[in-house]
């Protein structure tokens, strides 16, 4: 379990309020649970299982992403790192984000670091997830 938050500026609700978070996750149950949690903290959430889905959904709602979260092993057609990169390329500002994986390989860690994203390894507890996310907003 991670240490409790102690700094007053670390309130995730204050930091996520009004932020547009893109969530790339192919597992519908995980996607829904994560979306609900992010909405509880005040984020506007755009979800999908591919970059094409989330970019279309963001455009339909006229939203510009503040941050992207992607499962590394998204699908056979598009991995999470590629999908997050596509969202970044389509965003008119510098976009940061999190790549989440259970993969423990050094190669994946290096690939994520080269792409400029933060790697979180599963299982990720809520405090660690929120801390990493608020640092990327």
Regions found by a protein language model. Give the residues of each.
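Conserved phosphotransfer active-site motifs of two-component signaling proteins
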Residues: 74, 103-107
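Non-catalytic signal-transmission and effector/linker regions of two-component phosphorelay proteins
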Residues: 1-22, 28-29, 35, 52, ...
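Conserved phosphotransfer microenvironments
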Residues: 65, 69-88
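Conserved beta-strand scaffold positions in the cores of enzyme catalytic domains, especially
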Residues: 45-47, 97, 119
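Short hydrophobic/Thr-rich beta-strand motif most characteristic of the beta2 strand and flanking loop
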Residues: 39-57
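Generic detector of well-ordered alpha-helical packing
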Residues: 26-27, 72
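Conserved sequence signature across two-component system core domains
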Residues: 24-25, 48, 68, 100
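Hydrophobic/aromatic residues positioned on beta-strands within the core alpha/beta folds
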Residues: 95, 100-101
């Amino acid at each position: 379990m991670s240490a409790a938050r102690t700094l007053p500026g670390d309130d995730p609700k204050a930091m996520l309020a009004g932020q547009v978070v893109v969530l790339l996750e192919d597992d519908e149950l995980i996607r829904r649970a994560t979306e609900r949690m992010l909405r509880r903290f005040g984020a506007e959430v755009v979800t999908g299982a591919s970059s094409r889905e989330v970019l279309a959904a963001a455009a339909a709602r006229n939203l510009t992403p503040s941050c992207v979260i992607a499962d590394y092993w998204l699908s056979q057609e598009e991995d999470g790192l590629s999908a997050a990169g596509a969202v970044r390329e389509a965003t008119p500002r510098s976009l940061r984000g999190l790549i989440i994986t259970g993969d423990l390989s050094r190669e994946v860690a290096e690939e994520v670091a080269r792409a400029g994203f933060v790697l979180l390894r599963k299982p990720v507890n809520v405090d660690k997830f929120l801390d990493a996310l608020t640092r990327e907003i």
